[in-house]
Design a protein with these regions (language model features):
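Surface-exposed peri-terminal alpha-helical interaction modules
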Residues: 1-371
Length: 371
């Protein structure tokens, strides 16, 4: 495995903030999306876009920028359009599909576009922290929407301290203890960041302004048959069912699960977690596959080291804390809000799952094994 790709963790080493002039019309819609949605103009704006774009000369960072724009605009069209038919016009469907094929994931808004490639530092000369992150793209805008994404970006940044040291952990047994000590410190910082979600993201605003736009078309009552991508020959005019954006598409927790030996029983939850990998960048998918293979033998090598076992269990407890906080937020940001709103499902999460049941099961399966 090429460990160098983990130097920045699962965050990309380079993020494009604009595309070439050929994409000016797409950039315009993206830049003005909050106003377009507020004025119910998304349909007319999309139908004015040029259907075919040449993406042959785009680098990976530019493809990710294009994927971000088309994904946001596509979701805005489906969820911010007064029309009831769920058809994505050829004006965006054809190029969106081509981009998705190049990147190796479905034409849908995924975590990679929503968070990983959707930020910049306001001041590059200042340290990375929440106050110095700026979000590149949003739907309706506002601090609550931005803060929700910023928290995820900050968590990804902190996780890079774990991921960038994996090479030493796997290749040098003498580094076991120092790696685990560093990982424990990082996961504690991640939990501190997670605790800051309520500071600037209000549950009511999240539920009513942020959440509705990130749903997918699979296991969604609003799109029972899926969504048609107009003139995408590979789909033969048939509706497609893709999962919506969800934190389960982040590679951090699956990587920690593999490293720590946290397993999930063979059931629909496990199948869902495996499916989420299809929405991750290919490189992340490959890393997780390597970790799944290597981690079992690596864990065997530390079972005779009392200090390492103790540190491993401390990290597992911190992952348990993380999942417990996630479950708490699911209650306050979604379940409790849904009690007064029948139009925004509390049963199915944005990824199309019975999220409360799944999150609780995650929590129950995250327990130390070598106390």
């Amino acid at each position: 495995m090429d460990f160098s790709i983990l130097e920045s963790g699962f965050l990309p080493s380079k993020i494009s903030t604009t595309l070439s002039k050929e994409f000016d019309d797409i950039e315009y819609v993206g830049n003005n999306l909050p106003k377009i949605l507020a004025n119910n103009q998304i349909e007319s704006e999309v139908l004015n876009l040029e259907p075919e774009k040449d993406i042959s000369n785009l680098g990976i960072d530019e493809l990710e920028r294009a994927m971000l724009l088309y994904s946001y605009i596509g979701h805005a069209y489906i969820w911010g359009n007064l029309k009831t038919d769920k058809v994505i016009p050829k004006n965006i469907s054809k190029t969106w599909f081509k981009i998705s094929q190049k990147l190796g994931r479905p034409p849908i808004l995924s975590y990679a576009s929503y968070a990983l490639n959707n930020w910049k530092l306001q001041d590059k000369n200042k340290p990375f922290d929440l106050e110095n992150i700026r979000i590149l793209q949003n739907f309706l805008g506002g601090m609550d929407e931005d803060w929700f994404i910023m928290i995820h970006v900050a968590i990804e940044y902190e996780a890079k301290e774990i991921l960038s040291n994996l090479k030493h952990y796997f290749l040098d047994q003498n580094e076991d203890q120092s790696f685990l000590e560093s990982a424990l410190e990082s996961i504690r910082k991640i939990n501190s960041i997670m605790n800051r979600m309520p500071e600037k993201c209000d549950p009511f605003i999240y539920y009513n302004r942020v959440r509705p736009y990130i749903f997918g078309w699979k296991n969604n009552p609003a799109t029972p048959q899926g969504v048609i991508y107009e003139e995408v020959d590979e789909y033969n005019g048939k509706p497609q069912l893709f999962r919506g954006e969800t934190g389960a598409q982040s590679s951090i927790v699956p990587a920690l699960d593999a490293l720590l030996g946290i397993t999930h029983s063979n059931d629909p939850l496990r199948e869902y977690l495996d499916e989420m990998r299809l929405y991750m960048p290919i490189e992340h998918r490959n890393i997780l596959n390597h970790l799944d293979e290597w981690s079992e033998s690596k864990r065997r090598s530390v079972t005779n080291q009392d200090k390492s076992v103790k540190l491993t269990n401390e990290i597992i407890k911190e992952v348990h804390t993380f999942r417990n906080k996630h479950l708490e937020y699911a209650r306050t940001y979604i379940h409790e809000q849904s009690l007064s709103n029948q139009n925004n499902s509390n049963v199915v999460g944005t990824g199309g799952t019975p999220f409360m049941k799944y999150l609780d099961k995650h929590l129950q399966e995250t327990v130390p094994t070598n106390d």
